[in-house]
Amino acid sequence: MKISITAPAKINLSLDALYKREDGYHEVEMVMTTIDLADRLFLERLDEDKIVLDVKAHFIPEDRRNLIYQAALLLKNRFNIKMGVRITIDKHIPVSAGLAGGSSDAAAALKGLNIIWELGLSIEELAEISSEIGSDIAFCVYGGTALATGRGEKISALPNMPGCWIVLAKPSISVSTPTIYKELQVDNVEHPNTEKMIESIKNGDLDGIFASTGNVLESVTLEKNPQVKRIKDRMLAFGAEAALMSGSGPTVFALIKQYSRAKRVYNGLRGFCEEVYMVRPWSESENDTIN
């Protein structure tokens, strides 16, 4: 059996950290949505008991360091699977960008393996299993738009993000998520209005969504990396209704109603930033296939 499955990137419309928990993680409230910038995974069931990864991108491991490999190994051990799998990954999501590319790939792998190994697991079961690998994989299992709480693994679905244009720009720098969280001072930062964001999404109110964007991690990342702030400022100067860093960065995204204005923002970032994308909220228009 062979299947292909998409793994869309995500952005944080709002990201709040409330306090540091006893387990070392922060208690978070994040409103996230998937976008139509996506990787694609091709899975082939093997008779041999082995996991083979083939990543069509540089600097991405093909061994146990890869979340896809960890997802496959977790399912094999949990359910005593004696079959193997070959997974080929066609990468489009930037690496280490704050867009959950690795987590989305792992989520897609879990869903694909559930099919080719005929496990019969529900989405809820896959999401619960995924939390053993990473905090934000559960959201990627569900996709769409949702509120994530706890350390990011507790998911409450929300209506789809209203139609708009999204321009993403990733500078050529890397950001350490653990370092950003370690330096975050939750008592000395402006917190986003998560309730207002949820209300705006439920009402399909784009202006309310634009006004409610916020990310407490900007207080650290933008201070340490002025280039990220310059990208955000440039987006707003070219007409973005809202601009925000995704996750711990370094990618910044702009939210824009009109195509012509989005194109102006996109063109204004090209040449200023190496990786620039113009996308839409995820619509699941690209179907997964099974052969």
UniProtKB/Swiss-Prot annotation:
**SUPFAM superfamilies assigned to the protein according to its UniProt record, in alphabetical order:** GHMP Kinase, C-terminal domain, Ribosomal protein S5 domain 2-like
Record function comment: Catalyzes the phosphorylation of the position 2 hydroxy group of 4-diphosphocytidyl-2C-methyl-D-erythritol.
* Pfam families documented for this protein: GHMP_kinases_C, GHMP_kinases_N
Top-level taxonomy: Bacteria, Bacillati, Bacillota, Bacilli, Bacillales
Q: Which Gene3D superfamilies would you find in this protein's record?
A: 3.30.230.10, GHMP kinase, C-terminal domain
Q: Which organism is it from?
A: Listeria innocua serovar 6a (strain ATCC BAA-680 / CLIP 11262)
Q: Where is the active site?
A: 10, 136
Which EC class does it fall in?
transferase
PANTHER family reported in the protein's UniProt record: 4-DIPHOSPHOCYTIDYL-2-C-METHYL-D-ERYTHRITOL KINASE, CHLOROPLASTIC (PTHR43527:SF2)
Identify a single GO molecular function assigned to this protein. ATP binding
Parts of the chain that traverse the membrane: none
- Biological process terms in GO annotation: isopentenyl diphosphate biosynthetic process, methylerythritol 4-phosphate pathway; terpenoid biosynthetic process
NCBIfam families the UniProt entry points to: ispE (TIGR00154), PRK14608.1 (NF011202)
**Residues that, per the record, bind ATP:** 94-104
Highest taxon, organism lineage: Bacteria
Q: Which residues are connected by disulfide bridges in this protein?
A: none
Q: Which InterPro entries match?
A: GHMP_kinase_C_dom, GHMP_kinase_C_sf, GHMP_kinase_N_dom, IspE, Ribosomal_Su5_D2-typ_SF, Ribsml_uS5_D2-typ_fold_subgr
Q: In which pathway does it act?
A: Isoprenoid biosynthesis; isopentenyl diphosphate biosynthesis via DXP pathway; isopentenyl diphosphate from 1-deoxy-D-xylulose 5-phosphate: step 3/6
* Record keywords, A-Z: ATP-binding, Isoprene biosynthesis, Kinase, Nucleotide-binding, Transferase
Catalytic reaction annotation: 4-CDP-2-C-methyl-D-erythritol + ATP = 4-CDP-2-C-methyl-D-erythritol 2-phosphate + ADP + H(+)
Protein name as it appears in the record: 4-diphosphocytidyl-2-C-methyl-D-erythritol kinase
EC numbers for this chain = 2.7.1.148
